[in-house]
């Protein structure tokens, strides 16, 4: 089980430094060239690193399409509640971490501001960091659990 968790998280870890640096900042902007606001609906332009992260996360087994159930069952409503649960999460709460990550990755496909929100509110960073810490704590291999 631990090995499958490591394999799922490993492709996302290279994005940790970028997610940490981007915390509190917007990872998207609204395209407004060629007077687009006058004739049509404006649309967001995302940071390339964010798009690559979302693409990797979408392919990973960490995605839980039933993420809404995690939010309902644990009564998660605000970003602060998300951060509190993430910080307290351990091995047994792995599914909660998956649910929170999934809400933003999968939900961002239809609700344009979710990806940016997850970066600025540090949700992506905190979930990945906590997953990494859980794996490193429980992994007793000679490499000392380093991913």
Report each predicted region and the residues it spans:
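Short terminal alpha-helical segments
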Residues: 1-68, 126
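Short, Lys/Arg-enriched phosphate-binding patches
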Residues: 57, 67-73, 114-121
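Amphipathic alpha-helical binding modules
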Residues: 99-146
């Amino acid at each position: 089980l631990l090995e499958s968790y490591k394999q799922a998280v490993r492709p996302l870890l290279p994005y940790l430094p970028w997610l940490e640096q981007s915390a509190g900042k917007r990872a998207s902007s609204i395209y407004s060239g060629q007077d687009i606001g006058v004739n049509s609906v404006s649309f967001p332009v995302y940071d390339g690193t964010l798009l690559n992260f979302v693409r990797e996360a979408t392919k990973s087994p960490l995605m839980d399409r039933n993420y809404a159930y995690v939010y309902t069952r644990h009564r998660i409503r605000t970003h602060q509640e998300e951060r509190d649960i993430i910080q307290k999460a351990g091995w047994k709460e792995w599914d909660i971490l998956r649910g929170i990550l999934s809400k933003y990755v999968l939900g961002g496909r239809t609700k344009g501001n979710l990806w940016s929100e997850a970066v600025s509110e540090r949700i992506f960073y905190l979930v990945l960091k906590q997953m990494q810490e859980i794996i490193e704590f429980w992994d007793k291999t000679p490499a000392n659990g380093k991913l």
